[in-house]
């Protein structure tokens, strides 16, 4: 599997590079970084003390010409440029970027008519199994329970609520036969009035080096149930991304997510 990594100098990019280098079936063939990055020209394995022969570059076409797959955990504007390059070079994509607009998501859907794409806000096996637990719980706590989602991430995260929190909200709303767009409440301030019993609330915490904590609270009268997933390392995301690459190796064009990759549908 000839794999290139986008955002190669970032926290997630470095974890992905390490995972690829440690996988006997994978070959690192490219490492992309943003224009102007001080790491351009550096060996992709330098932070591991390894010489890979792959230099960080901002030349999209040079990298895509070598790759079969690109793993991308960057930002929406960068990812959309990578999608265009992938279409030019027929490269399959594993996308863990969050914060897309509705229009950008539509563009991803259109691109998937020509290339294979796994798009998931969280590639952890644990998170995706948690989504199934939430669907089950929501069906049994559909009456008399208020639903709130609380997430916490490191101080550098730029979007809120997290993509994973939104996935959890969509899983719960879908199980209840609702649209998240119609029932989500993002943060509260001032005099908000009494809680709408059909709403799903979101709260976001940012601080320190928190990798990612997510709790879905079902609060009833006399009891409350909390379903929590905590990430202590980005290793789980990197391993999930490699599972997604293997999944795409046996697939043609189409838009998939980790529920497809893990056979949880």
Swiss-Prot record:
Pathway: Amino-acid biosynthesis; L-lysine biosynthesis via DAP pathway; (S)-tetrahydrodipicolinate from L-aspartate: step 4/4. GO terms for molecular function: 4-hydroxy-tetrahydrodipicolinate reductase; NAD binding; NADP binding; oxidoreductase activity, acting on CH or CH2 groups, NAD or NADP as acceptor. The keyword Cytoplasm applies. Its main location: cytoplasm. Pfam families: DapB_C (PF05173), DapB_N (PF01113). It is an enzyme of class 1 (oxidoreductase). CDD domains: DHDPR_N. GO terms for biological process: diaminopimelate biosynthetic process; lysine biosynthetic process via diaminopimelate. NAD(+) binds at residues 7-12, 33, 96-98, 120-123. PROSITE patterns: DAPB. The keyword Protease does not apply. (S)-2,3,4,5-tetrahydrodipicolinate binds at residues 154, 163-164. NADP(+) binds at residue 34. It catalyses: (S)-2,3,4,5-tetrahydrodipicolinate + NAD(+) + H2O = (2S,4S)-4-hydroxy-2,3,4,5-tetrahydrodipicolinate + NADH + H(+); (S)-2,3,4,5-tetrahydrodipicolinate + NADP(+) + H2O = (2S,4S)-4-hydroxy-2,3,4,5-tetrahydrodipicolinate + NADPH + H(+). The active site is at residues 153, 157. GO terms for cellular component: cytosol. Its EC number is 1.17.1.8. Belongs to the DapB family. Catalyzes the conversion of 4-hydroxy-tetrahydrodipicolinate (HTPA) to tetrahydrodipicolinate. This is 4-hydroxy-tetrahydrodipicolinate reductase. It comes from Burkholderia orbicola (strain MC0-3). The gene is dapB.
């Amino acid at each position: 599997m000839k794999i290139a990594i986008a955002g190669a100098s970032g926290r997630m990019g470095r974890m992905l590079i390490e995972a690829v280098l440690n996988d006997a079936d994978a070959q690192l063939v490219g490492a992309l970084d943003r224009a102007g990055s001080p790491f351009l020209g550096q060996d992709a394995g330098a932070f591991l003390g390894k010489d890979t022969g792959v230099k960080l570059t901002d030349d999209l076409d040079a990298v895509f010409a070598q790759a079969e797959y690109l793993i991308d955990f960057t930002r929406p504007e960068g990812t959309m440029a990578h999608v265009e390059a992938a279409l030019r070079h027929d490269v399959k994509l594993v996308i863990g970027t969050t914060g897309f607009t509705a229009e950008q998501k539509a563009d991803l859907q259109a691109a998937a008519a020509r290339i294979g794409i796994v798009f998931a806000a969280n590639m952890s096996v644990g998170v995706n199994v948690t989504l199934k637990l939430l669907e089950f719980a929501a069906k049994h706590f559909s009456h008399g329970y208020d639903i709130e989602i609380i997430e916490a991430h490191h101080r550098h995260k730029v979007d809120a609520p997290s993509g994973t929190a939104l996935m959890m909200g969509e899983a719960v709303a879908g199980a209840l036969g609702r649209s998240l767009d119609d029932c989500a409440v993002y943060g509260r301030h001032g005099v908000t009035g009494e809680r709408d019993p059909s709403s799903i609330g979101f709260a976001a915490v940012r601080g320190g080096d928190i990798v990612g904590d997510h709790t879905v609270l079902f609060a009833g009268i006399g009891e409350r149930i909390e379903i929590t997933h905590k990430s202590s390392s980005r290793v789980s995301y990197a391993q999930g991304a490699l599972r997604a690459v293997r999944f795409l190796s046996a697939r043609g064009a189409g838009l998939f997510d980790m529920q497809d990759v893990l056979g949880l549908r």
